[in-house]
Amino acid sequence: MMFNSYEKGPYFDEMFRSDEGDTFSHYSTVLNRLDQWPPSKLLEKQQKIDSSFLEQGVTFTVTGDTVHGTERIFPFDLIPRIIPDAEWQKIEQGLSQRIIALNLFLNDIYHGGKIIADGIIPEDVVKSAAHYRPEMVGVDVPKDIYIHICGSDLIRDGDGNYLVLEDNGRCPSGVSYLLENREAMKRAVPGMYRALGVRPVDDYADLLRKTLEFLSPRQAQSPVCVVLTPGLYNSAYFEHSFLARQMGIEIVEGRDLVAIDGYVYMRTTRGLVQVDVIYRRIDDDFLDPQVFREDSMLGVPGLMDAYLKGNVALANAVGTGVADDKVTYAYVPDMIRYYLAQEPIIDNVPTYLGWREGDRRYILEHLEELVVKAANESGGYGMLMGPSSTKEERVEFAQRIEAEPRNYVAQPVVSLSRHPTICGDHIEGRHVDLRPFVLYGEDIEIIPGGLTRVALTKGSLVVNSSQGGGSKDTWVLYQ
């Protein structure tokens, strides 16, 4: 009876309606099964999963951790998060709406900027974004799609409402952990998995490959697609190699490719093979030393020439980072209204913008109450958690905001929903978010569920793996 001492606390709890044990109906089967197991059985299953992840190399890299080392398994919790069908349908609709609007925005700002001319978003906000690429002005990308793979992060507030926390439209990561989590759960709790009627996720690699092939500039029967990785020491290398293997395509580094006369080729033992589509897991800055950073050893000299001539496709497109910008994020609801004449299905978290004088004054006067974020940082870096910050940290961030107001946003602290999580020999609530993965090719495909990330440190709201977070399997139920 590991749940007997469980406390819901003053948060929205994914499993329990109240401290008295009133359970949401879609969790009743899981709770009944788990409650029948002695703690030793639950812990044994958890340990088997941890061991299998270690054996399979399901790891990520933490930069600068000299105490525990850089390579570690991605922490996983056995108790699944469950999303009923009706709830998931709304999430799907909201994410589809959002990725369409973001792609229309990117196409617009690189082709005349009507949304700017109509006063919806200031020109300076767009063109001062760190990842705005003037090289892409007037360039037509394949199928007019810029973001082919997206991972928008969702949270739930104290009333259980879903909110978009941020958009990841450059190189969203984490889907390999989602897929590995599912396989681990099917082995660990097969009876429970079958009993609930969980929607599968194992066609993701096929859908991703079809999305990439759809972008091919050549009308070849089998377009040549590759995954371009920075290499073995990148924090997400496990994912790069995993996805290439699952799709049945080559994983390459920049040195494995060569650009000749406006085309890109892969070096093989059989000679050069023309490449049609590159799923790049490298930021724009490092793609081509002839166009972006001259010191890049990760990219391919001449790649941008081939790309701009339409002879090779890149997923995601160059210049999508404008949509990743946390200042741009604040305007996405307006984009939805402007391009689609619809109200947002999933709302944003209220956001204060440092470049607006009134907002900046409010931010500086309420640093203790707010979460402050740098516009282009990720992974929990460049962030001030006001309620847990020191006076010195607040002074430092105030100085940063004054020096670079365009580069900072602030949001009220949203008490993320909590989910029962195994903590040693008992169960406690831990805060969670959700990263669903959206593919935009011939159709929009959203993988049922997503990666539920868990803040494993008690009381923490930071779920990022780089900051010690873990994950859960996410079960979307059939109707």
Describe the residue ranges of each PLM region:
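Preference for protein termini
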Residues: M1-Q479
